[in-house]
A protein has these predicted regions:
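N-terminal signal peptide c-region/cleavage motif recognized by signal peptidases
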Residues: 13-17
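Short, hydrophobic alpha-helical packing/hinge segments within bilobed ligand-binding/sensory domains
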Residues: 76-78, 86, 95, 183-186, ...
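Short, glycine-/small- and polar/acidic-enriched structural segments
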Residues: 21-168, 174-177, 193, 222
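Sec-exported extracytoplasmic/periplasmic mature domains
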Residues: 54, 82-86, 101, 163-167, ...
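Cleavable N-terminal signal peptides
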Residues: 7-8, 18
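Bacterial N-terminal signal peptides that target proteins for export
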Residues: 1-6
Length: 301
């Protein structure tokens, strides 16, 4: 009898502990990649995730540890997702493909759950040169040094553009890895001949006067998009939290659509990216289509 009572107390203690658990929600964002705003920055700054998190049923006694970590590109974000340090992540098509491969290599899986923004033609990516450069077109960059964030959507665009010129990317151009925050200084110092990048840098650098765009991603006529991914094991364990994240993302997108000027200013305050450049992407005639719907053309990305 005593053993039965003790067993019952242990079981009750375990059940109480399980129902009162603290659930981690770790989200990797790319704040300066402003077309990811509806999947990260705005959700965080406006407290939208907390608005939709479940507090009934299995989550009645749960508490949440919401963690945010910002990155400047998708590759390092993927590394932390695979290592189990992040549950959600926002990134573009090319790094998203690497994300899937990296998860499978580790014996796990990630799930693509939502588009955040994109262009079926490839707008948003681009190649810029220093403003004082005499280079006027991509064809003049043969034998030159072009930097690009490694494994980014801009990297994919650059490889397509080089192939379209009939060049060997290992012999005819010197492609080096360089994140946007370093590339800006390198362009101003004349340390590189050109830089390929994703949203918003192909517009931001020329806007600030130290670079000039010579190639727009739309010239590659290959779609590009940014979206959100989640660790599959996490999604299976906490599907209601994935739904909460998606609902928060939908509201963030609706707010952007309703008041693009207001939220372009907020994004500028958080990231330092000029509000006018933010509006180029989030305004009603934006460079990209900012919505959460999947388009068949995105499969080509």
């Amino acid at each position: 009898m005593l053993r039965a009572v003790i067993a019952g107390l242990v079981l009750a203690s375990f059940t109480l502990s399980a129902s009162a658990e603290t659930i981690r929600i770790a989200i990797g964002t790319q704040d300066t990649t402003i077309n990811c705003a509806a999947g990260g920055l705005l959700i965080r700054e406006l407290g939208l995730l907390e608005k939709y998190l479940p507090h009934d049923g299995a989550y009645k006694n749960a508490s949440y540890d919401v963690q945010w970590k910002n990155f400047t590109s998708g590759a390092p974000l993927t590394n932390e997702m695979v290592a189990g340090k992040l549950d959600f992540g926002a990134m573009a098509d090319f790094p998203g493909a690497f994300n899937g491969v990296a998860f499978e290599t580790a014996g796990k899986h990630s799930l693509f759950i939502s588009v955040l923004s994109g262009s079926i033609k490839g707008s948003g990516n681009g190649i810029v040169v220093p403003s004082a450069s005499g280079v006027q077109s991509l064809s003049e960059l043969k034998g030159k040094t072009i930097s690009v964030p490694f494994a980014s959507t801009a990297h994919g665009m650059l490889l397509r553009a080089v192939a379209a010129q009939g060049w060997d990317p290992l012999k005819d151009v010197n492609i080096i890895a360089q994140p946007p925050e370093v590339a800006g200084s390198a362009l101003q110092a004349g340390k590189i001949d050109a830089h390929a990048d994703f949203v918003p840098f192909a517009e931001l650098f020329p806007s600030r006067g130290f670079a000039r765009k010579i190639y727009d991603g739309a010239q590659a006529n290959a779609p590009t998009f940014h979206g959100a991914l989640v660790d599959q094991a996490y999604a299976k364990k906490h599907p209601e939290i994935v739904v909460a994240y998606l609902r928060a993302s939908i509201e963030a997108n609706q707010l952007l659509a309703a008041e693009p000027e207001k939220y372009s200013e907020l994004i500028a305050k958080v990231t330092g990216v000029d509000a006018e450049v933010n509006y180029l992407f989030h305004g009603p005639l934006g460079v990209q289509t900012r919505d959460l719907s999947w388009k068949p053309e995105y499969r080509q990305a």
